[in-house]
Amino acid sequence: MLTVEEIKALIPHRYPFLLVDKVIELEAGKRAVGIKNVTINEEFFNGHFPHYAVMPGVLIVEALAQVSGVAIAKAQEGTNKVGLFAAIDGCKFKRPVRPGDQLRLETEITRVKGPIAKATGTAYVDGEVAAQAEMTFAFKDV
């Protein structure tokens, strides 16, 4: 398991844009499972939507990308490379994510070729699919 501090050592995201609270499973370069506890205190709920708070779908996908980034970064430790979110395909939103929900973010790295990696991700709430997407990352020297 990785704590938020260990996650911050692997990916560059910080508050308010770090969307992963912990990683509970990790196989470097292969797969990761992360958790995001969604609370009413999230800044985005002020405007999305004031009378029916729903987590923006794009932020659910960003959370999946961050978990994928942890798996990629763990395999790249010791290098000056970071995996940047480059593309998204086949994205589907199946249910709203609301304050009080816990997102289980499951990702798998499906291909790494040269400076490009591909991953699939599924976000669950209480075992029910909330969102799924295919993601592409480009490695960049930093």
From Swiss-Prot:
The keyword Cytoplasm applies. It catalyses: a (3R)-hydroxyacyl-[ACP] = a (2E)-enoyl-[ACP] + H2O. It comes from the Bacteria. This is 3-hydroxyacyl-[acyl-carrier-protein] dehydratase FabZ. Involved in unsaturated fatty acids biosynthesis. Catalyzes the dehydration of short chain beta-hydroxyacyl-ACPs and long chain saturated and unsaturated beta-hydroxyacyl-ACPs. Belongs to the thioester dehydratase family. FabZ subfamily. SUPFAM superfamilies: Thioesterase/thiol ester dehydrase-isomerase. One of its GO terms (biological process) is lipid A biosynthetic process. GO terms for cellular component: cytoplasm; membrane. Keywords: Cytoplasm, Lipid A biosynthesis, Lipid biosynthesis, Lipid metabolism, Lyase. Its EC number is 4.2.1.59. It is found in: Cytoplasm. The lineage of its organism: Bacteria, Bacillati, Bacillota, Bacilli, Bacillales. The gene is fabZ. The active site is at H48. GO terms for molecular function: (3R)-hydroxyacyl-[acyl-carrier-protein] dehydratase activity. Signal peptide: none annotated. Its main location: cytoplasm. The keyword Lipid metabolism applies.
